[in-house]
Amino acid sequence: MKKILLAAALSLTFLTAGAETLSSIDQTGTWIYLYNSQGRKYKTLSTSSVGEVLGYSSTFFVARNGAWIYLYDADGRKYKTLSVSTVGEVLGVAGDTFTSRNGAWIYTWSRDGRKISTRSAR
């Protein structure tokens, strides 16, 4: 029983070891810096590959580079690519969702890049 508990504890430690909590993003010049909840810089990304950061939460951030919207996890890994013509203008990021406006419509998207809801922009 002790061996099972020890194995479970070790596996949980390794699974969460790389997961950072994104507290702040600083975009200066050609670099984007990610900071954790202790205020420590833990990742540096190039603006030439990421583009412009449009918004962030503690678990992910949204960036635009040319005609593409990219979703990145808190560790700075790109995991989803969406077209600007589909998403439109990103209005904000909150929690595990982000909101965009495309023409006369406002869309709410999940952090996975799935459209959750649509409403008229009035």
Q: Which residues fall in each region the model found?
A:
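Mature extracytoplasmic domains of secretory-pathway proteins
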Residues: 44, 54-81
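A short beta-strand motif characteristic of beta-propeller blades
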Residues: 40-51, 77-83, 115-119
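Short loop/turn segments that connect beta-strands within beta-propeller blades
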Residues: 37-38, 73-75, 110-112
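Short beta-strand elements that form the blades of beta-propeller/WD-repeat-like
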Residues: 20-27, 32-33, 57-65, 69-70, ...
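Positively charged n-region of N-terminal signal peptides that target proteins for export
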Residues: 1-4
